[in-house]
UniProtKB/Swiss-Prot annotation:
Region of interest: Required for localization to kinetochores: 349-410
Modified residues (Phosphothreonine): 189, 216, 297, 363
Region: Binds microtubules and contacts the microtubule-binding domain of SKA1, residue numbers: 195-410
GO CC term (a single one): spindle microtubule
One biological process term in Gene Ontology: mitotic sister chromatid segregation
Superkingdom, natural source: Eukaryota
Signal peptide: none
Listed name of the protein: SKA complex subunit 3
MF terms (GO), sorted A to Z: microtubule binding
Organism: Mus musculus (Mouse)
Post-translational modification Phosphoserine, affected residues: 34, 119, 138, 154, 158, 289, 324, 352
């Protein structure tokens, strides 16, 4: 129902109510209605309030209708703009496709789709026409009215306005006939499988990593590196030469110790005699003791309290040489343990060393003032005016970039 019609109906009912109430009030004023209890002013106020609520409701309904009208108008405008854009895009696409030989279908072919008829034979004819059109589209070698007779071609630079970048003109492929196309299709189709021939499947290879063994040998470390390679070679040759020398000495003289000097031969090189040791665990105690560390402080001399020439070395009896050629004797090795009583007997009191001028840490002598600058002299004369400058002190000229003390507030 239209809100305006409902509003008029309510307004008509209100007018009739007002007429009846006005007549009743007039009768009450004349004294005809003795049972009237409410005052006429209250009734009039109620009527005015009802009319005001009705007006508010009508205004709200009108606002809602106006908003809906505006939204519908806005939707129509947006739809028109979108339709115009779509039509422009379709037009551009049609022009772009026409450059490559595309032609739009005729209206007569698509007329059967929009034609609505109640007869069944006509619908069957229309379906047959549609199926024929689909077959023509799928088969490009059969010419028809709906499909363009020109074959599709690849895009060229001339289509985009870039003719000057063409280097060489490639001749187009000659048009193929229907027979050649059929032969190519037959050649491309794979041969049919013969059901009588059974192809055996390749069995899967199961990987067993537990039973896998590496065929390459393991890499073992023989203790040969860039630091020990030359030493191993030298000492190996030395041991071979030492074996020959020792056997000759033992045969000539028995019980004599081998000399500590380097041994040479005609077909061998010099071997350091005092560094050869027996390769046994019991000979560890014959290792030479290291030298004590030396601490050096610049500008400070510490007198030495120990003289290494006074140390008394004690020679311990060495183990008897065995008859086997693999063992070697230790020669000229400093013993690891020394007798403490004999060591401290040779200690002497160190002589007192003279202290040089560099080592004297006394208070330095005060500097001698030979000249007083001019700015310092002005400050001294300002505080004590009776002070007379000595004759030997010369006033030096003011240096560049210095400021006087007289105008100190304006610095």
């Amino acid at each position: 129902m239209n809100p305006i019609q409902s509003f008029h109906c309510k307004l008509r009912g209100l007018a009739t109510t007002l007429d009846s109430e006005t007549a009743r009030l007039l009768r009450a004023l004349d004294g005809e209605d003795s049972d009237f209890e409410d005052s006429p002013g209250r009734i009039l106020h109620d009527l005015h309030s009802e009319v005001q609520t009705l007006k508010d409701n009508v205004n709200a309904l009108l606002d809602e209708a106006r908003l809906e009208n505006q939204e519908s108008t806005r939707f129509k405008k947006a739809t028109k703009i979108l339709m115009e854009k779509n039509s422009a895009d379709v037009r551009k696409l049609r022009e772009f496709f026409q450059k490559y030989g595309y032609q739009a279908r005729d209206k007569e072919d698509s007329g059967c789709e929009h034609r609505v008829n109640n007869s069944t034979p006509e619908l069957a004819v229309c379906k047959d026409i549609q199926k024929a059109g689909v077959k023509e589209l799928s088969d490009p070698c059969v010419p028809s009215g709906s499909v363009s007779e020109e074959p599709l071609r690849s895009p060229q630079l001339s289509d985009f306005g870039l003719q000057r970048y063409i280097i060489s003109q490639v001749p187009a492929n000659p048009p193929q006939t229907a027979a050649s196309l059929k032969e190519e299709r037959v050649a491309e189709t794979p041969p049919a499988k013969d059901p009588s021939v059974q192809v055996l499947k390749t069995p899967r290879c199961a990987l067993r990593m537990d039973d896998f063994e590496c065929e390459t040998p393991k890499l073992e470390h023989f203790g040969i590196s860039e630091h020990t390679m030359c030493l191993n070679e030298d000492y190996t040759m030395g041991l071979k030469n030492m074996k020959n020398i020792k056997s000759s000495l033992l045969s000539g003289v028995s019980g004599e110790a081998i000399g500590t000097g380097p041994v040479t031969s005609d077909n061998s090189f010099a071997i350091p005699g005092p560094i050869i040791q027996q390769m046994e665990e019991n000979d560890v105690e014959y290792v030479s003791s290291p030298l004590p560390p030396k601490f050096c402080t610049p500008g400070l001399k510490i007198p030495s309290t120990m003289d290494r020439t006074d140390l008394v070395s004690i020679d311990y009896p060495l183990s008897k040489p065995n008859s086997s050629s693999t063992d070697l004797e230790i020669k000229d090795c400093v013993p690891l343990i020394l007798n403490s009583d004999e060591c401290y007997q040779s200690f002497a009191e160190p002589p007192s060393s003279a202290i040089t001028s560099c080592e004297n840490f006394a208070t330095p002598s005060p500097p001698k003032v030979t000249a007083i600058p001019e700015d310092i002299l002005q400050m001294i004369t300002k505080h004590s005016s009776n002070l007379a400058s000595p004759l030997d002190v010369k006033v030096m000229p003011r240096r560049k970039g210095t400021r006087g003390a007289a105008n100190k507030e304006n610095w």
